[in-house]
């Protein structure tokens, strides 16, 4: 009887410790924040190919969206630490209507924007996707031709 109680207690402890662990998409080279996991991918892709890659990477993933300055600064620091190419990085903001009405691919509210100087400009009426600018330490954004190839930042829900 004593052994049964001991084994049962041991199993209960294991169960409780495992049930407290959240399954997430975060790996050692990812940034967990606000119920999301952010991961940089260095392989250059067009904006559309990058979004499709994120969606296939794990359920609930998209190119990253930003909603506060503090969040943007943490992500910029993460990219600076883990991004090998030191080049621009796609995020999930685009202008589908081509009328400066920017939308996130995850359909979250466009409540925060952080454009670089004189941006967005839709240069030559061809720039409708958004990248983080490396020369700003990944703090500021630029609209870019969607067919350009950049590294990209995915975000996944825990």
UniProtKB/Swiss-Prot annotation:
What is the annotated tissue distribution of the protein whose record heads this document? Answer: Expressed by the venom gland.
Q: List the disulfide bonds.
A: 26-37, 54-154, 61-156, 129-146
GO MF term list: carbohydrate binding; metal ion binding
**Subunit comment:** Homodimer; disulfide-linked.
**Residues the record lists as binding Ca(2+):** 119, 121, 127, 142-143
C-type lectin domain: residues covered: 24-158
User: Signal peptide position in this chain?
Assistant: 1-23
Identify the InterPro entries for this entry. C-type_lectin-like, C-type_lectin-like/link_sf, C-type_lectin/snaclec_domain, C-type_lectin_CS, CTDL_fold
- Under which name does UniProt file this protein? C-type lectin TsL
Q: What does this protein do?
A: Galactose-binding protein which recognizes specific carbohydrate structures and agglutinates a variety of animal cells by binding to cell-surface glycoproteins and glycolipids. May be a calcium-dependent lectin.
**Gene3D superfamilies registered for this protein in UniProt:** Mannose-Binding Protein A, subunit A (3.10.100.10)
Q: Where in the cell is it found?
A: Secreted
In terms of superkingdom, the source organism counts as Eukaryota
The record, for SUPFAM superfamilies, names: C-type lectin-like
User: What keyword terms does UniProt attach to this protein?
Assistant: Calcium, Disulfide bond, Glycoprotein, Lectin, Metal-binding, Secreted, Signal
Q: What is its main location?
A: secreted
Q: Which Pfam families match?
A: Lectin_C (PF00059)
Kindly give any further remark recorded in the entry. Met-33 has been shown to be oxidized to methionine sulfoxide but this probably results from sample treatment prior to mass spectrometry.
Where's the motif Galactose-binding? 119-121
Q: Report the sequence similarity comment from the record.
A: Belongs to the true venom lectin family.
Supply one GO CC term from the record: extracellular region
Q: Glycosylation: which residues?
A: 28
